[in-house]
Amino acid sequence: MNDRYLYRAKRTNNGEWVEGYYAVARDRKGLTQHNILIADNDIGYFKWIVVDPSTICQCTGLKDKNGKLISENDIMVAHLDDSFPEDTTYTRVVWNNNGFCTKEQGSEDISPLDKFDQEYFEVCGNIFDNPELLEVGE
């Protein structure tokens, strides 16, 4: 599976994160369901996992400095100045118009997600499980 097309979201039945393809379908009652499809190699089909649509995050296809995939709504951290180790920068990964960007805490400015972010930042959480990380320093 190409990383760029991966999605992740929280299951509705237990709140666990699942990762796979994203699909919208209707259930037997005609209600819209948001699903993550996970390949079940034992039987050659996909498992359809119902997820909370408010937690759906698309993978950027990029990896952080530790090789971890970066997804929409991830929170990344970096120590950009070794002479001031207490000076920590937190950013949130967001979608803006035509691409993934980073939005630094306490700022309205956004910057394209790029190689600099991959080299210096690491994923340290996400806005759903770790919202307090964005409150640091505000």
Predicted regions and their residues:
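Secondary-structure transition motif
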Residues: 1-138
